[in-house]
């Protein structure tokens, strides 16, 4: 029978930190995916506005929150570009945070696997 390593308070703190980091990592991945989809949708909307003729581009409905606001094509393009820029900025921040969290999780994994070996499993099943 293999001897089991004792779990110290520091080890438990690392395990807890890893668990919290994993939850945050999962949340950040979902947020990044959502923001990437939003940027793609904005790009598609911008392309569609370019395809409109002069008559149709005079009043284009755009959903903001729970209501629709009518824009002309120039105003809508400005609105879409501003929305895209702000979304890309937030996406870059979230991606940076995700990379930092992932690096910290890898560091914690090395420490815990070094002490406990195959007695623990910290790898996500995907």
From Swiss-Prot:
SUPFAM superfamilies: Prefoldin. One of its GO terms (biological process) is protein folding. One of its GO terms (cellular component) is prefoldin complex. One of its GO terms (molecular function) is unfolded protein binding. It comes from the Eukaryota. InterPro entries: PFD_beta-like, PFDN4. Keywords: Chaperone. Belongs to the prefoldin subunit beta family. Binds specifically to cytosolic chaperonin (c-CPN) and transfers target proteins to it. Binds to nascent polypeptide chain and promotes folding in an environment in which there are many competing pathways for nonnative proteins. Appears to play a non-essential role. Heterohexamer of two PFD-alpha type and four PFD-beta type subunits. This is Probable prefoldin subunit 4. It comes from Caenorhabditis briggsae. The lineage of its organism: Eukaryota, Metazoa, Ecdysozoa, Nematoda, Chromadorea.
